[in-house]
């Protein structure tokens, strides 16, 4: 009976080992999944250094270059054409060199020149007339100002003469009156001084 027990113990020990190994193998992945990754310290992370961006000055050759402005044509701008009479010689055809281009019809050219000359002459004449009128107005104003000044001077002279005539006849009488008046004034002044120096005293009578 003893050998049977031993075999049973051996057989019972083997499956226990297998179950323990399987439990260990199952527990390993659980442990790895349950672990939390720790954040790395900031010192270990290397960032690229910031680069200095230097602004280009205005005197830089790139900024000094003149940019050509685009010139738009009449077709691109869609400008309306004005109703004007333009002779053939005025409009410059494309692809032609600079120079005078005369009109075939001399009569039309002469009419245009006559109209332009008449307008210019009229403007010049109007300017000349205006200038003459302004000169006449200025002369009239000057004459008025001179007449006013002369009238003022005459009035002043008349007033001066009247004052001089009044002073001349009163000069002889004024001398004698002046002496008498001066003596009277001196007496009055002396009497006023004495009255001030000697005040009025009250008199009391015992009865």
UniProtKB/Swiss-Prot annotation:
Which molecular function GO terms apply here?
mRNA binding
Q: What is its main location?
A: nucleus
Q: Which GO terms describe its biological process?
A: intracellular mRNA localization; mRNA transport; ribosomal large subunit biogenesis
Q: What superkingdom heads the lineage? A: Eukaryota
Q: Give the UniProt entry's GO cellular component terms.
A: nucleolus; preribosome, large subunit precursor
Sorted keywords for this record are: Coiled coil, mRNA transport, Nucleus, Ribosome biogenesis, Transport
Q: Extract the InterPro entries matched here.
A: Loc1
**What is this protein identified as?**
60S ribosomal subunit assembly/export protein LOC1
Provenance organism: Ajellomyces capsulatus (strain NAm1 / WU24)
Question: What are the top taxonomic ranks of the organism?
Answer: Eukaryota, Fungi, Dikarya, Ascomycota, Pezizomycotina
This protein's encoding gene: LOC1
